[in-house]
């Protein structure tokens, strides 16, 4: 009996939360920020030949890789 009461409570709570989400204008997951302006990740720094000078500079400062492109 307690299990049934618990399941009914959880189902009603989920319906209320779903209704609040739509009423508040929230329709989906929060989008990720664009990659522009984000620091390059370590795997990007491993492929030095594909980097721009600014990305190579960031890789050199943060991770110590691709520094030969900056000194170039």
Swiss-Prot record:
Subcellular localization, as worded in the UniProt entry: Cytoplasmic granule
GO molecular function: chitin binding
Protein's UniProt keywords contain Signal: yes
Assigned keywords, A-Z: Amidation, Antibiotic, Antimicrobial, Chitin-binding, Disulfide bond, Fungicide, Signal
InterPro entries the record matches: Penaeidin
Domain of life, source organism: Eukaryota
Family listed: Belongs to the penaeidin family.
Protein name in the entry: Penaeidin-2b
Species of origin: Penaeus vannamei
